Swiss-Prot record:
Matching Gene3D superfamilies: Bira Bifunctional Protein, Domain 2
Alphabetized NCBIfam families for the sequence: lipB
Gene Ontology annotations of biological process type: protein modification process
Site (Lowers pKa of active site Cys): 161
Catalytic activity: octanoyl-[ACP] + L-lysyl-[protein] = N(6)-octanoyl-L-lysyl-[protein] + holo-[ACP] + H(+)
Organism this protein belongs to: Verminephrobacter eiseniae (strain EF01-2)
Gene name of the encoded protein: lipB
Protein name: Octanoyltransferase
């Protein structure tokens, strides 16, 4: 069964989350998977793991609680937000692979614009080297975890985060998703510790020299997600 893609444009965050929850609650085995592509007005969202100490100075930007995974992030105009509503049991993969597939779709999308996307162990999302966005050098390996000690902290040296990911799974079905920064006002990211990491730099495509309209970026991201989330 093919995924149904809907480009929604700019929509209210809370109304969109409610619509995702409603569809997930009522969907049956024959209902199609959906992919919603949209953007939101300026707001911060706190995930289930969110801590108030990571919201530094929100000012006039509202902070909303969300039932997605992860910590605090910012949404605003110029960001493509993709919400896959997938029956994971029917698709045949678990949450860990689902996250990997979303990240891979973003990486393949960036590659078509001449940008190399990277994963950072322990920190979901996609990162780029702002000073060398097209370079293919591998990131340093994460030191192994010693028995009885916490995992080493993620190493963001020389990196900027370009796509944030936070998902929710209910009744084996996913909602929420991934946000790709295209051409945004990035200043609000300085008012938080993005995704719970103090000092983590956030970038968008325009920062690294890629000029795209929102609809162009949304179309390609949607296409890659359809490919990589297929059963």
């Amino acid at each position: 069964m093919s995924m149904v893609v809907r480009t929604l444009g700019r929509v209210d965050y809370l109304a969109t989350v409610q619509a995702m929850q409603d569809y997930t609650a009522r969907r049956g085995p024959q209902d199609p998977d959906l992919l919603w592509l949209c953007e939101h007005d300026r707001l911060y969202t706190q995930g289930l793991a969110g801590q108030d100490r990571h919201v530094l100075a929100p000012g006039d930007i509202p902070v909303l609680q969300s039932n997605r995974g992860g910590q605090v992030t910012f949404h605003g105009p110029g960001q493509v937000v993709a919400y896959p509503l997938i029956d994971l049991r029917r698709a045949g993969y678990y949450v860990k692979e689902y996250v990997y597939r979303i990240e891979e779709a973003v990486i393949r999308c960036l590659a078509q614009w001449g940008v190399t996307g990277h994963r950072v162990a322990g920190a979901p999302g996609i990162y780029v080297r702002p000073d060398d966005p097209g370079g293919h050098a591998l990131l340093p390996l994460r030191p192994p975890k010693s028995p009885g000690t916490p995992a080493p902290a993620p190493d963001f040296q020389g990196l900027g985060k370009i796509a944030a990911l936070g998902v929710k799974v209910s009744r084996h079905c996913s909602y929420h998703g991934v946000a790709l920064n295209v051409a945004m006002d990035l200043e609000p990211f300085a008012r938080i510790n993005p995704c719970g990491y103090a000092g983590l730099r956030t970038v968008d495509l325009s920062t690294i020299g890629v000029r795209l309209r929102w609809d162009e970026a949304a179309q390609l991201l949607g296409r890659q997600l359809c490919i990589w989330l297929a059963p």
